[in-house]
Amino acid sequence: MSLLDLPTLWNASGVEALDSDLFEYFCCVASGSLPTFGHDATALRNILVRTALEGETASAAAVLQALLAFSSLHRYGLQPQALELKITALGSLAKGSFTPGLGTKETIEHIAAGMLLSSFEVHQSSCTSGHWTGYLGGVKTITDMSSVKTLLQFSSDVAVLLDWVHYHNVLARFSLLYWNGEETSEFPSTPTNLLSSQDSSLPPPIYSMMDLLSQICDLSNSAIPTGTSDEVDNYKGFLKVLDWRIRSLPIKGDNDGEMLLMKLYQLALLLFLNRSFEGLIDQPIRMQQQIGQAFAILPRLSSCRQQFPIYVIGCEARTDEQRAAVLDLITKTEKMSTSRSFNHCRTLLQAVWTQDDLAEWDDISYRAKLTLVISRCAVAPIFV
């Protein structure tokens, strides 16, 4: 695709000649590596590019600069050009924040810039990439203060942007359940489901998966009832309903690869729910069957860009064969131009396996196990 393929209402004159290469590279290549699940990659690219080029505000300039920074990082790795563009984007975003009473257009620009900056930080999963929580937390604060209905009325494809925000919010909450670092204070803890299923651009099963994962995180972050037997029974009943809802998800896809990926995500949700509430959900035979199904799927996938299912299922790997299947899928995925680094995911899995082999997890809860491992990271990981 060339710039001539972009809709004519986009005027790229705001892109400096030296940056036009990076702009086209973002449109053709780098945008495909933005962490998503179930999103239309072209639609996401389109709203980001349009937001960057249509506006004349400081926050619109921040979108363009953050877009170019991500493109530079994707193409050349972490080097001065990418860092300078990121710093320039932060300056423009700060300048735009002083505008009294952000309008709808400026709000969308702030959201787009913040998400691109967050994506910049998590792309390489390096020891300096811990600022993603601050950027994502800022985006969440803006969306919480905004009228979603007004944002959707501004443009039909804003739903794509808000779904992208929600996906990152949910996976961030999963990570921060087990993270003891300072970054947790930068991220608002209140769950937010930005869009109804009718307004969302996501396929219904994927929308439901994100909603169910969010609910499991809510429960994991709250105290388990220890009162009357009725309270405990009601709690167990709700967990069984969640388990049933996940198992009842209609798994559909345009091809076998999509269906296998969605099935893998479904199995990861079931395992996460069952492991998080061991003792309250007692179905060991069914869980072992689900683990077997998950490991049977791994070698059939050509790639899996989504890191949550790989991590959750990888934590169940006990044999060399199972671990090799996980690492092989990670390797195949990282060879794709649309993949981001699996550094954190791979390192965390290897730490879990080492401790499993040493039998150091006896009499320790699933939450304590994940907390011990994830909190060893220098910065909070995110499994998008």
Curated annotation (Swiss-Prot):
Gene it is expressed from: iacI
Keywords carried by this UniProt record: Nucleus, Transcription, Transcription regulation
Listed name of the protein: Transcription factor iacI
Principal localisation: nucleus
GO molecular function annotations of the record: DNA-binding transcription factor activity; transcription cis-regulatory region binding
Localization terms from the record: Nucleus
Cellular component GO terms held in the UniProt record: nucleus
GO terms (BP aspect): positive regulation of transcription by RNA polymerase II
Purpose of the protein: Transcription factor; part of the gene cluster that mediates the biosynthesis of iso-A82775C, a enylepoxycyclohexane and biosynthetic precursor of the chloropestolide anticancer natural products.
Documented applications: Iso-A82775C is a precursor for the biosynthesis of the anticancer natural products chloropestolides A to E via a Diesls-Alder reaction with maldoxin. In the absence of the prenyltransferase iacE, siccayne accumulates instead of iso-A82775C and can also be condensed with maldoxin to produce chloropestolides H to K, which show also antibacterial and anticancer properties.
